[in-house]
Amino acid sequence: MSERQPQILDLEQVIKSKAGKKAKYIPKFVINWFKKFVHIDFINEYLKEGYVGVEFCENAVKYLGVELEIAGLENLPKDGRTYTFVSNHPLGAIDGVTLGAVIGRQYDGKIKYMLNDLLMNLKGMAPLGIPVNKLGGQARNLPKLVNEVYHSDNQMLVFPAGLCSRKIDGKIQDVEWGKSFIKKSRETGRDIVPSIGPDHLYAYRLSAAFR
């Protein structure tokens, strides 16, 4: 069990840090609106518990009241090797915490994600993440960080679309997947294990209501 790290997330500071010199142009009411939009009080109530790593994911699932129906768990490899687990991305952040909870528990917490760098502000998620900037240029050391993880003893969790699923021609589907995970998996001798989350309209609309 990891040592707990209770946290109160200062969302205003996160926004200002991300915006840099442009922060002074962001009206206060916009920041206040965004706090309500992301339910920051609800988030901070959970962050006070201080869960870290896979425990953060597992308890976030419980806190959100999500009931998981998992099929094929018995098929997960248990041969001591490392794998690349790939998944569609229909529901947003909840995809990450649920996949992390399930895969992380099966592999003793030895998992890593490619994470939106904003999520690295969550102490509980940060140890699991490789930060990816969705709003600007990438850090120069990103290729090095990715390479290190693929060569490590961690299981790699990847959402190849890089974005949440979209409604396209009346169907909920991922945008085109990036292929770098295939190249890196080949280079490091990792087999790729696919998984799939709910892609029906009801789940999509429900998740969209909370985005």
Where are these regions (language model features)?
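Membrane-anchoring hydrophobic helices of lipid-metabolizing enzymes
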Residues: M1-Y83, G96-T98, D108, A126
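Catalytic core of membrane glycerolipid acyltransferases/transacylases, capturing the structured
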Residues: F29, H39, G80-G137
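Short, flexible loop segments at the rims of nucleotide/cofactor-binding pockets, characterized by
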Residues: Y46, A60-V66, V132-Q138, G170-K171
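Amphipathic coiled-coil/heptad-repeat helices and related helical stalk/stem segments
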Residues: E69, A139-P143, W177-G178
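Generic beta-sheet signal
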Residues: R81-S87, N154-P160, R190
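Short amphipathic alpha-helices and their capping/turn segments at secondary-structure boundaries
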Residues: K144-H151
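A cross-family acyltransferase "interaction/gating" segment
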Residues: Q155, G162, R166-R211
